[in-house]
């Protein structure tokens, strides 16, 4: 498994591939650990910058993939990325098993999915808006403190922006202040047109 370079150029363009996680959710697709290792090697050969390997701790096959990758996957171009969630509401970050599993994967980069639509915070997470921000900030700071580069994946960002424009921005600022390198603005439902995205990010 490769390690992150000391500095990341501001003008660099990177391809972030999600075949091994998001792609594995397609109907009829079921990767074995050996399949995932083989695909990762091919993606590395293509020059992909980041390979999202799966969700360690949540999916046993993904946990095993990262364990085998430590010894069997020698990447020349790509960084392996572990996908996961922030700490649970009301739980200390250093005691949260799903966060610790991200560390145990030994992936140099972690993508954290975070609720950026207030309706999903209240209805799905069933917690307060402030606690959700704390969950993001605590988890990012903890992982960065352990030497990981962190991307924050803002789920339902554009739908949430229509409902409450300020909250998604507050979440991004919280993540950045805690040390996140990248904020991913996700059109989770796929309903945005390019012109609408351009207006919201301008």
Name each region found by the language model.
Residues 1-11:
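Conserved oxyanion/phosphate-binding beta-strand-loop segments in alpha/beta enzyme cores
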Residues 4, 53-54, 82-84:
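N-terminal start-of-chain detector that recognizes signal peptides
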Residues 10-15, 22-51, 58, 66-75, ...:
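Alpha/beta enzyme core
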Residues 75-83:
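A glycine-rich helix N-cap at a beta->alpha junction
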